[in-house]
């Protein structure tokens, strides 16, 4: 591959950021074709039928969905490996990536970040206080309880830095934009993990 890959998306999106961090650690050159979240023209609709970012365009393929993109990049550029080599760990990493993309996306993006940042500042809409209250009192603590049972006290999830670390950590960047920080007294492993991973290059 001689030309940089193109990523259509916004830095605000944790799914875009996941792919950009992945590209950075793979040392794959890329360029951003920026798009405002939730908007897009007819061309974008053709590239992404579900109108979601990121979209990757390279010399072989156009792909949507951050997980599909990262797995494609891993297959095409296997070194340095960002998915564990052990098949059980690799499957577990994919599960954590799926948990992050779905459950954490729902809680940290739709119920927290969108309510605090996107709705008032992009759409000019009021924050739904009922949704936000439930997120802060029930949904987010539930996610953090689960992460606390899965994350290591030191280092990364599977020893070496991997997609699992990236996929989880990107949501805490958006959470910070919304004024949320993990309570280190209640969830010490998660708080330490987030600080370690977000300190890595590319975030």
Language-model features and meaning:
Residues 1-134:
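GST-like domain detector, emphasizing the conserved glutathione-binding G-site
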Residues 3, 100-199:
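GST-like fold's C-terminal all-alpha helical module
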């Amino acid at each position: 591959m001689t030309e940089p890959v193109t990523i259509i998306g916004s830095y605000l999106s944790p799914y875009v950021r996941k792919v950009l961090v992945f590209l950075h650690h793979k040392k794959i050159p890329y360029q951003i074709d920026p798009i405002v979240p939730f908007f897009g023209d007819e061309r974008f609709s053709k590239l992404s039928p579900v109108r979601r970012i990121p979209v990757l365009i390279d010399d072989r393929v156009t792909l949507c969905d951050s997980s599909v993109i990262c797995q494609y990049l891993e297959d095409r550029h296997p070194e340095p490996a960002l998915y564990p080599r052990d098949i059980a760990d690799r499957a577990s990493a994919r599960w954590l990536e799926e948990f992050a993309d779905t459950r954490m996306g729902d809680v940290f993006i739709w119920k927290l970040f969108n309510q605090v940042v996107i709705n008032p500042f992009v759409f000019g809409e009021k924050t739904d206080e009922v949704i936000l209250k439930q997120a802060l009192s029930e949904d987010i603590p539930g996610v953090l309880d689960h992460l606390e049972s899965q994350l290591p006290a030191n280092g990364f999830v599977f020893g070496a830095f991997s997609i699992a670390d990236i996929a989880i950590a990107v949501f805490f960047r958006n959470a910070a934009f919304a004024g949320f920080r993990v309570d280190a007294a209640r969830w010490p492993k998660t708080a330490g993990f987030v600080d370690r991973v977000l300190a890595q290059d590319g975030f």
